[in-house]
């Protein structure tokens, strides 16, 4: 039995969404039933519908995340739910970066289960009181979605952990993947229920919702959509092991802006797009941009910040002052090294504690003078790996304390319980050094919080009995593998796996001079205070507005099924070439010129066999037999190959090697471009290209009579691209005084004589026709790559300049839906062949058949 396909899960989850009309300007009553989109697009709406709430024309931000920034509990006496804002959630403080007039709506799940019978009431109250739209997932879906696919598959993979065997991680499970898609669909339904397309900007957060953009983009082509990934993004070698890798990549690419904490994470994402989807990227005015089917997808690299005011208000609490005095008295005479981490296999807890043990071994003078206080936050997931990490941590702490401790000295203090925010802040404020030793982490804001607490407040200083003018100090020891490390340049960076080096770094941090500690602290505090969560939200929001600015200037349509859906966006004047209309124009005309590229136009680019098909030869022969037609193949291929492949077409013109050689028909001689025949430069270029070929596996040299081309389509994409840039620079330097042009095309670097291009040769052919009194009133030009763009541009320029009084119908057409100077497109080579057959049938005399046997194929075409 064939395997079941899961590529169309979007359709299964969503039903038919494409036929629903555009969202009107009103906000429907909050929905509570997953999968039902009521009153979003005019269904069941009558005049005076009481359920419809008018919306003012006001900018809104819809923040979508797995969890709402709320805390909730059910009152045991009244049975009523009580909710409050979670001030520890960064999402709650995003509004600090928006203008005061901006309305913020949150969409997400609650952190606690609400019975189905209570969901209607809870939904209504949350929206009315907090502007929150609750997403209720069925319990089985939530378990498979969050604890299953997110925590057992995506989370480990994004942190470079592969399930090499059953004992180390969960293998890919299609059932969990289906739950992930279903959960994302439920989130999409909620967003669709409140979206106001023209005013709203949607900002999606983290790996839990990576296919949500596909649902939204499929439903609303011009939705303004941003995504920020709060976890690492793995290298392509790790990511490519994921069976649903393309679905997730295309999901993110359906956004207008994708955010990452560091360039490393963005670089890995770009590498995946390049290697798996064949996309190219460039830097545009300081912004990294991917060209994706006519849309420009921008990347944003900016680490998140913290809410300074929130943390400072905690430092001013009376409870904090009391805890400060308590800790200060308890550890008087000792320097505190502080760690605050989740109980997680990626946080490097055991490595950190081992490094502290090495510190005590290597520097026995520190015994009794330093203490490592490790606060352990509750684990976010559950499983054998968490239990193993906890056991290893406890065993290591016990061994160290038994060996180095005494009745009044405990070297390692492990606090494994929920620690109130005020207590953590007190430990931050009194710690001489803070160490974050994670082996892999997305951002980690512990160093930020530590630095702000070390800066203190007047109230805290009063509690400690220190002057406000006293210079502040702080020291950070940070793993190289966490997102905040690049931002805090004054930190001591370490490889967490090198336990000895970490121990030495801790010793350096403790014994560092106060002046150096002050300088490092000042540098960090300035960065943290100027890059808070408000700055982060404002910067991302501004870039999202910029990225979605031209949505209404292009024509958009969706292609692909299921989670392979993507949006094509092109110029409003760019449309599919109608074979019927082209044939009609051909029939009306008296003199015609047709210019055709070869590779990618008459023969598929990916085809190993480069000979033209029998259908192509038959159509070309029929077109060439018409004395009113001038047909040319304009190609970068050599004249020998083209002559051999197109030999059956006696009257076919050929412009080989981009027009360096031209032949009007098979019986005529080859003409050169009239340029100098001095090709001595090839003796310089060929050895250089050979050197790059030897050092770039998968590359090769194509030697033409007039040009040399270095191909790297079979090389590693990143390395081949890098080598091509280097080769381009090398050749441009060497050939600066030679009459040649060095071009970089799609996976090639080409050196050819100046004054040779497809645009110039088509212009010369048309000029010759005009000089001979053959003024074409019908011109077709078809190509598929960059070199053909010059043809499209030159044809209209030549005809308008030399025959302004003549009315000529010009059909410039590119193969494939992509940005082009042509006005028309055909999807693939087979469409080009159908067009040529349609034109050929018009030129050729029709055989006489009985009327009842005549069949028209135009409707099929």
Curated annotation (Swiss-Prot):
The keyword Zinc-finger does not apply. Keywords: Glycosyltransferase, Phosphoprotein, Transferase. InterPro entries: Glyco_trans_20, HAD-like_sf, HAD-SF_hydro_IIB, HAD_sf, Trehalose_PPase. Gene3D superfamilies: Glycogen Phosphorylase B (3.40.50.2000), HAD superfamily/HAD-like (3.40.50.1000). CDD domains: GT20_TPS, HAD_TPP. The modification Phosphothreonine is found at residue 32. Its EC number is 2.4.1.15. GO terms for molecular function: glycosyltransferase activity. The modification Phosphoserine is found at residue 5. SUPFAM superfamilies: HAD-like, UDP-Glycosyltransferase/glycogen phosphorylase. In the N-terminal section; belongs to the glycosyltransferase 20 family. In the C-terminal section; belongs to the trehalose phosphatase family. This is Probable alpha,alpha-trehalose-phosphate synthase [UDP-forming] 10. It comes from Arabidopsis thaliana (Mouse-ear cress). The lineage of its organism: Eukaryota, Viridiplantae, Streptophyta, Embryophyta, Tracheophyta. The gene is TPS10.
């Amino acid at each position: 039995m064939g395997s079941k396909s899961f590529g169309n899960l979007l359709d299964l989850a969503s039903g038919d969404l494409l036929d629903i009309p555009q969202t009107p300007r009103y906000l429907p009553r909050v929905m509570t039933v997953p999968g039902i989109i009521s009153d979003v697009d005019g269904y069941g709406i009558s005049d005076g519908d009481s359920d419809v709430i008018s919306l003012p024309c006001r900018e809104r931000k819809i923040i979508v995340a797995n969890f709402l920034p709320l805390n909730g509990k059910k009152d045991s006496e009244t049975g009523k739910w009580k909710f409050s804002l979670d001030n520890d959630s960064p999402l709650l403080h995003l509004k600090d970066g928006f203008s005061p007039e901006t309305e913020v709506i949150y969409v997400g799940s609650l952190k606690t289960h609400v019975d189905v019978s209570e969901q209607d009431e809870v939904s209504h109250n949350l929206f009315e009181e907090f502007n929150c739209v609750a997403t209720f997932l069925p319990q089985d879906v939530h378990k498979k979605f969050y604890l299953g696919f997110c925590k057992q598959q995506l989370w480990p993979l994004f942190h470079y952990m592969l399930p090499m065997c059953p004992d180390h991680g969960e293998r890919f499970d299609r059932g969990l993947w289906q739950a992930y898609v279903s959960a994302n669909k439920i989130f999409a339904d909620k967003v669709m229920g409140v979206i106001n397309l023209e005013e709203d900007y949607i900002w999606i957060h983290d790996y839990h919702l990576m296919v949500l953009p596909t649902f939204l983009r499929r439903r609303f082509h011009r939705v303004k959509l941003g995504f920020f990934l709060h976890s690492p993004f793995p290298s392509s070698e790790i990511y490519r092991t994921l069976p649903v890798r393309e679905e997730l990549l295309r999901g993110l690419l359906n956004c207008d802006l994708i955010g990452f904490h560091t360039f490393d994470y963005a670089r890995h994402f770009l590498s995946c797009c390049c290697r798996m989807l064949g996309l190219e990227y460039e830097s545009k005015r300081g912004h990294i941009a991917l060209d994706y089917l006519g849309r420009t997808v921008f990347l944003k690299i900016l680490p998140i910040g913290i809410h300074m005011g929130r943390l400072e208000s905690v430092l001013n609490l009376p409870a904090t002052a009391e805890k400060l005095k308590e800790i200060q008295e308890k550890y008087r005479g000792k320097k505190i090294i502080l760690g605050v981490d989740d109980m997680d296999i990626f946080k490097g807890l055991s490595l950190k504690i081992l490094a502290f043990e090495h510190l005590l071994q290597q520097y026995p003078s520190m015994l009794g003078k330093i203490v490592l206080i490790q606060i352990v936050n509750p684990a976010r997931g559950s499983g054998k790996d968490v239990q193993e990490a906890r056991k290893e941590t406890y065993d290591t702490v016990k061994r160290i304390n038994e060996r180095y401790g005494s009745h009044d000295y405990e070297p390692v203090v492990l606090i494994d319980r929920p620690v109130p925010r005020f207590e953590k802040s007190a430990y931050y404020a009194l710690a001489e050094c803070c160490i974050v030793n994670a082996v892999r982490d997305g951002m980690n804001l512990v160093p930020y919080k530590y630095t702000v607490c070390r800066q203190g407040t007047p109230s805290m200083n009063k509690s400690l009995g220190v002057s406000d003018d006293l210079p502040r100090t702080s020291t950070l020891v940070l793993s190289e593998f966490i997102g905040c490390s690049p931002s805090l340049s004054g930190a001591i960076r370490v490889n967490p796996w090198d336990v000895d080096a970490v121990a030495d770094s801790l010793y350096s941090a403790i014994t560092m001079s106060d002046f150096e500690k002050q300088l490092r602290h000042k540098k960090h505090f300035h960065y943290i205070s100027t890059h808070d969560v408000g700055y982060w939200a404002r910067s991302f929001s501004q870039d999202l507005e910029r990225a979605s600015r031209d949505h209404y200037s292009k024509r958009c349509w969706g292609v692909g099924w299921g989670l392979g859906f993507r949006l094509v966006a092109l110029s409003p004047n760019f449309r599919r070439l109608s074979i019927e209309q082209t044939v009609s124009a051909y029939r009306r005309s008296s003199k015609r010129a047709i210019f055709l590229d070869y590779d990618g136009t008459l023969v598929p680019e990916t085809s190993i066999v480069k000979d033209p098909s029998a259908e192509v030869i038959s159509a070309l022969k029929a077109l060439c037999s018409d004395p009113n037609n001038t047909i040319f193949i304009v190609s970068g291929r050599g004249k020998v190959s083209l002559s051999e492949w197109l030999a059956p077409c006696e009257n076919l013109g050929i412009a080989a090697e981009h027009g360096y050689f031209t032949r009007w028909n098979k019986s005529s001689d080859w003409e050169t471009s009239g340029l100098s025949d001095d090709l001595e430069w090839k003796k310089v270029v060929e050895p250089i290209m050979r050197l790059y070929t030897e050092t770039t596996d998968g590359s090769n040299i194509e030697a033409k009579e007039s040009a040399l081309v270095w191909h790297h389509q079979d090389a590693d994409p990143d390395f081949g691209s890098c080598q091509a840039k280097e080769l381009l620079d090398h050749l441009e330097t060497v050939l600066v005084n030679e009459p040649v042009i060095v071009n970089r095309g799609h996976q090639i670097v080409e050196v050819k004589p100046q004054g040779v291009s497809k645009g110039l040769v088509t212009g010369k052919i048309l000029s010759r026709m005009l000089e001979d009194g053959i003024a074409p009133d019908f011109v077709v030009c078809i190509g598929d790559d960059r070199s053909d763009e010059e043809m499209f541009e030159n044809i209209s320029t030549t005809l308008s300049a030399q025959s302004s009084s003549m009315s000529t119908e010009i059909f410039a057409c590119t193969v494939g839906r992509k940005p082009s100077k042509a006005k028309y497109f055909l999807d693939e080579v087979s469409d080009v062949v159908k067009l040529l057959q349609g034109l050929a049938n018009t030129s050729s005399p029709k055989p006489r058949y009985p009327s009842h046997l005549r069949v028209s194929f135009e409707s099929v075409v």
